[in-house]
Amino acid sequence: VERSRGLGDVYKRQVAINVTARQARKLMVAQAKARYAVNAAGRRHLKDLVQRKKATNTSLSAELHIEKMRNDLGYFQHRPTESFKGRDVLRRAPAHVKARVLKSSAMTALTGDGANLSKGFLVEFKSGHVGMVQRRIGSSSSHTVTERGRPRWRNKDGKVEKLVTMGSPSATAMHSTVWPYVEPEVTEYLYDRLMEQTERVIARAKARKG
């Protein structure tokens, strides 16, 4: 009887922990979306948070995990949203692309530093992702043609300058930042689920006794 009672106690904790882990994931994704000005691609990155480890009867712990490299600014809100090529750069592209990382911040023009890095602009990569990059002023790149075999832009010295990705917080960093905000709610949720499971065990025990 005591052994069965012990196994039942372990099982109810296991269930409560796994349910809480799933709820924690939902809360973290929602909080990150509320804080960060991610676009559709950025929101998909946030949802890559998964439950890698589930609680079992031998290990009462669960683990959430995400494997993502650092995002570029193209995963956050920016205007315009399309990249411009060839003559469209002169005809349609604005003087500066604007972007923001936090929803609480205003859109900022990506003007560059005027010395080492050019203003920011959008480039469509072979994967189809539209990323935010800058040119390293005065540098020389060996990649002189585009993915489609077209000549790349050259500076006044005839050099094709190297492109540098404009970095921004990774999905991992964003989730780490929002965790302290959701932790109290997750703790309370776990307590409620443990109480719920306990009440179910008690109810079943009473039912068996008649």
Residue ranges and their predicted role:
Residues 9-32, 36, 178, 182-198:
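Long, contiguous amphipathic alpha-helices that act as assembly "spine/axial" helices in icosahedral shell
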Residues 30-62:
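Translation machinery proteins
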Residues 49-210:
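Charged, low-complexity interaction tracts
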